[in-house]
Amino acid sequence: MTQESFQHHQLCNCTILTEEWEAILQAISVGKYSWACVLMLHTAGYNPLTYIPYRTYIRLLKNNSMPDTIKTRKLQHIGAKFVAIKIKMMELD
């Protein structure tokens, strides 16, 4: 295994807040597993559109509400600016 591939598979160095865990666990407890995955990806700092089809992601956003703590963290993450713009546009509709 080379050094490059090792660095690629390292776990993210992120802290998950209590409110974020509660939102993820609540989604799991009511059977919204796809939404829990979206919340987990946002919390870890990943862009869900990398892993979830666009139409599925938009449907999940329309049917669920993103907790404020995850919204704030997502907006601070540089790679998630496009997603934030999409959410703002959906809120205006």
UniProtKB/Swiss-Prot annotation:
Keywords: Heterocyst. It comes from the Bacteria. Disruption phenotype: Single deletion, no change in heterocyst differentiation, in a double hetP-asl1930 deletion no heterocysts appear before 48 hours, by 120 hours only 3% heterocysts form. A triple asl1930-alr2902-alr3234 deletion makes 50% more heterocysts than wild-type (although they are not active for N(2) fixation), while a quadruple hetP-asl1930-alr2902-alr3234 deletion has delayed development but makes wild-type levels of N(2)-fixing heterocysts by 72 hours. One of its GO terms (biological process) is heterocyst development. Induction: Transcription is up-regulated by 6 hours after nitrogen stepdown and continues to rise for at least 24 hours. NCBIfam families: HetP_family. Delays heterocyst differentiation and commitment when nitrogen is limiting. Interplay between the 4 HetP paralogs controls the timing of commitment to heterocyst formation and its duration. Epistatic analysis show that the 3 paralogs act upstream of hetP to delay commitment (asl1930, alr3234) or inhibit development (alr2902). Asl1930 and Alr3234 must also attenuate the activity of Alr2902. Ectopic expression partially complements a hetP deletion. The N-terminus (residues 1-68) complements a hetP deletion for heterocyst formation but only partially restores nitrogenase activity; it does not bypass the requirement for heterocyst differentiation master regulator hetR. In bacterial two-hybrid assays interacts robustly with Alr3234 and weakly with itself, HetP, Alr2902 and HetR. Belongs to the HetP family. In Nostoc filaments, approximately every 10th vegetative cell terminally differentiates into a heterocyst specialized for nitrogen fixation under nitrogen deficiency. This is HetP-like commitment protein Asl1930. It comes from Nostoc sp. (strain PCC 7120 / SAG 25.82 / UTEX 2576). The lineage of its organism: Bacteria, Bacillati, Cyanobacteriota, Cyanophyceae, Nostocales.
